[in-house]
Design a protein with these regions (language model features):
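ALDH superfamily catalytic-core signature
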Residues: 4-5, 198-252
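Aldehyde/semialdehyde dehydrogenase
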Residues: 27-41, 173-189, 196, 200, ...
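N-terminal Rossmann-like NAD(P)+-binding subdomain of aldehyde/semialdehyde dehydrogenases
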Residues: 1-97
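General beta-strand structural signal in soluble alpha/beta enzymes
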Residues: 135, 168-170, 190-193, 208-212
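Conserved small-residue-rich beta-alpha loop and adjacent elements
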Residues: 84-155, 159, 204-208, 215-216, ...
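A structured beta-alpha segment of the ubiquitous adenosine-cofactor-binding alpha/beta core
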Residues: 85-98, 166-187
Length: 252
């Protein structure tokens, strides 16, 4: 039995997410998804400082004050059902309604650098599309991942939704990742991490959405306000001690 999405094995976590996804698409509509997301934001916003302190305590990375800002963005600004478009095509033959269907169960890998923000943001976006997700968290952030998964699931249940919209094995390893990647129920893989992680996910032969190495350049040319550019680069590159892969790493 799971404990708000936490299971002893990856196979149990996958099975629970698969069962939840079937119930999700059968019994709940777009308005329900909006309600679940609103409840996640409502219940987790007051816990942002708690989450930030937990991340720093467990991983030893970054700065608490910056994690507060990062987790706030993940909880309050991650896109929901408004990002799921629908359309109607009219012709002499009638009307055709176009809408996006869910993948089903998604397998996701999360990093030690952004353990709580990644899980919450991923789950909001994925459930907006009618999916459920099985996370394989970084082993150095198990407490963070557990808090995020349980917090999200509790909010959804409190809003009248199904259990196990997001799940994870209690003790994630490379072996549990294999169990998730190659599970027939898992139709899409999502990864946040480095090039090795991307290569591993690609080996499953499934659709993959993954972020590889982050080395973004900044171009500062003759039209730039140098003082403003320097201040912006400094603020970005020092945010959370430069943990974010999107922060400036080199300059042209």
């Amino acid at each position: 039995m799971g404990n708000l999405g936490i299971f002893d094995t990856a196979k149990e976590a996958v099975a629970a997410a698969a069962a939840a996804q079937k119930e999700f698409v059968k019994n709940y509509g777009l308005d329900d998804r909006e309600r679940f997301i609103a409840q996640i934001r409502k219940e987790l916003q007051p816990r942002i400082e708690e989450f930030a302190k937990l991340e720093y305590e467990e991983t030893g990375y970054g700065r608490i004050e910056d994690k507060i800002g990062k987790d706030t963005g993940a909880i309050m600004l991650s896109p929901g059902t408004e990002a799921v478009p629908t359309g109607v095509i009219a012709s002499e033959k009638g009307l055709t309604v176009e809408y996006y269907a869910p993948f089903g169960v998604i397998g996701a890998v999360t990093p030690v650098t952004n353990p709580i923000a990644t899980i919450i943001a991923n789950t909001i976006c994925m459930l907006a599309g009618g999916n459920t997700v099985v996370f394989n968290a970084h082993p150095a952030s198990i407490r963070c991942a557990t808090a995020a998964v349980q917090g999200v699931n509790q909010a959804i249940v409190n809003a009248g939704g199904p259990e196990n919209i997001c799940t994870m094995p209690a003790h994630p390893t490379m072996e549990t990742l294999d169990d998730i990647m190659f599970a027939p129920e898992v139709k899409l893989l999502v990864g946040t991490g480095g090039p090795g992680m991307v290569k591993t996910l690609m080996s499953a032969g499934k659709k993959v959405v993954a972020a590889g190495p982050g080395n973004p350049p900044s171009i500062i040319d003759e039209t730039a306000d140098l003082k403003k550019a320097a201040a912006g680069v400094l603020a970005s590159a020092t945010f959370d001690n430069n943990l974010l892969c999107i922060a400036e790493k080199k300059f042209l």
